Amino acid sequence: MPFPPAPQGGFPEDRVVWVFGHPRSGTTWLGHLLADGLNLKMWNEPYLGQVLGFANLLRDNEPARFQDPTFWMSEQQEAHWPASLNTFFMDVIARQGGAAKDHAGLAIKEPNGTVVAPLLLKALPQAKAIFVLRDPRDVIASLIDARKPGSWMGERVAEEFNRTRVVNQSIKRFQRIAAGLQELEQTAAGRLYEMVYERLRTDTFGEMRHLAHVLGIPCDEAVLRAAVDKNAYERIPAERKGPGKFVRTARVGGWQEELEPGEITAIHRQLGDFLRSRGYEIPGEAGGRP
């Protein structure tokens, strides 16, 4: 029996906005701002990007196999596979993304698919993307807190808590994301907005208004201001935020007090070039964002 056709009235490709960034970079907060302030329908972490993760694994671990033209996503087949993936992703969006009526667009929050963002944007040449960039040191400090026993994430993670493992895994992930971001800037030039978390914290309304302008999303400033106020960290009740909670501190630069000296050294040694290239200050060096 053939499958039923996808429903009509879904989101066209040019109204799809992917939200990428390392987990704990503020993508959830941004998602609320997009939904409440810019009227985008939010699709929270469908893990669509994860289906492409095997391509990166093959490229890293078996480069000869990755180059083999019999591999359907090899470079030799690049004239073909983006169209196939486009058909797949747009069908999934049509079937599961819901109706486009009454929404300015569909925001797909996919932090766990960030490492394959370039592949997604190659396959969806009309879609837009937001990349949330936050100081990796604050991100890693947040992940350590989240993984501790008794924390919101620690209760869901089976493996025993190990600070060193969390730091090392995060560094490796940031290295992959750094390479992916460079590729994404080329692949999605003109339809990519790099949202710096520290700027979003300083001027939330101004950054969101600028994002809407750059990506061509309609913006009612009164609605946006109300959304900014509604979703401000300061508005969250004290019992719902703090150490061990999903919403922690939203503090910029807290890593200096929260990370151990050896962890900071390891991060600077392995991610120093990325930090400098994105304007983040390394103590003892001149310039950059604090």
Model-identified regions with their sequence ranges:
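Beta-sheet entry/capping signal
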Residues: 16, 39, 128-129
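PAPS-dependent sulfotransferases, especially Golgi type II membrane carbohydrate sulfotransferases
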Residues: 1-17, 144-147, 153, 175-186, ...
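PAPS-dependent sulfation machinery
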Residues: 32, 36-116, 123, 149-161, ...
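PAPS-dependent sulfotransferase catalytic domain
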Residues: 57, 62-63, 101-223, 233-245
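Short, solvent-exposed turn/loop segments enriched in Gly/Ser/Thr/Pro and often Arg
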Residues: 21-23, 45-49, 231
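Short hydrophobic segments within beta-strands
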Residues: 18-20, 43, 132
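Short gly/pro/ser/thr-enriched loop/turn and capping motifs at secondary-structure boundaries
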Residues: 49-50, 137-140, 228
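Walker A (P-loop) phosphate-binding motif
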Residues: 11-34
